[in-house]
Amino acid sequence: MSARSIGYSKWTEILIRALRSDANLGERLILEITENSAMLVPELVSKFMADMQKKGISFAIDDFGSGVTSFRHLKEFRFDILKIDGQFIRGIETNSDNQVLTQALLSIAEHFGMYAVAESVETEAAAHWLLSVGIDCLQGFISGVQRSIPLGR
């Protein structure tokens, strides 16, 4: 989601109407907010998230590490899922800098009770490395097919 869509009242009305029509929709819905969008209007995003989380919706911060989020915002926003940007994942099996950064982000996700997703997983070697450090979900083009592999907690 973009900051613009969060601030668009018509979209929010449609979402609330859908939630009212299906009591189980909220618990099945995950909305992704890019790191940069969250920072454009943090107060609006924070209020929207709090309101929707009360209705059972989960939120993922997408492309984390690609923008300007301070760690303070991770605490304030209360995202449910942290999606680690692909720039830290590509080549991770041999890039020690990316390994250290990914492990740090995974530790932060664990501390705040967030589900950790590795984006842009493209090789079996990267998948094995990420599994060995405890990532919760792999997302990317493994074996040439885009897919997400939830690993369970």
Model feature map: region roles:
Residues M1-S9, R28-P42, K55-R153:
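EAL-family c-di-GMP phosphodiesterase catalytic domain
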Residues I14-A18:
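A short, hydrophobic coiled-coil helix within the histidine kinase transmitter core
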Residues S21-G26, M52-K55:
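Short helix-capping segments at alpha-helix termini
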Residues F48:
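Conserved functional hotspot residues or short segments at active or partner-binding sites
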